[in-house]
Amino acid sequence: PNSNIELVLSKAADVIPYVEHGVCDMGVVGKDTIMEKGGSFYETLDLGFGKCRFCLCGKKGEDFYAGYHTRTIASKYPKVTRDFFSRKNMDVNIIKIEGSVELAPLLGLADAIVDIVETGTTLKENGLEPYETVAPISARVIVNLASMKLKKQQIQALTEQLQEGLRAKDEAKKQEAKKAESKQDK
């Protein structure tokens, strides 16, 4: 009620610079953008929506890890891809693709892709399958470093309100599921 919250709508890629540079105190952005762009901010809350995952994907039935050759990976997310294969101590060539990444293995451009997978329908339609999950993704709250110090009380209060809203939503879903289950039992 006595809040002076101002909302700014922007593209996901712009949320981080707005928060980092203090134009906005807080922002909501996907973990995919955080992992790819990085930056100086606090990641304070997983909002639990927009859930999907980064996956290593390729042609159905192929053994991606067979053999010892350097693989070529296509992705819109070269940093995420590089970090993933670095953790596995694997040398890969990464090709940044902006559009339909799933075409790269089909056209012989890449051995596999690293991309966001929600349902897997697009992969199936293109004869691909997920080989491995790289990282889970969902919407996150980020906070400017200076704002966290200067406006800590307000930011904590808003974060707690968001958490309470998420808990209430989860509880409502559980109640709805129980009602549906009891109707089926009758």
Put a short name on every predicted segment.
Residues P1-K186:
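Domain-level signature for soluble enzymes in the chorismate/prephenate branch of the shikimate pathway
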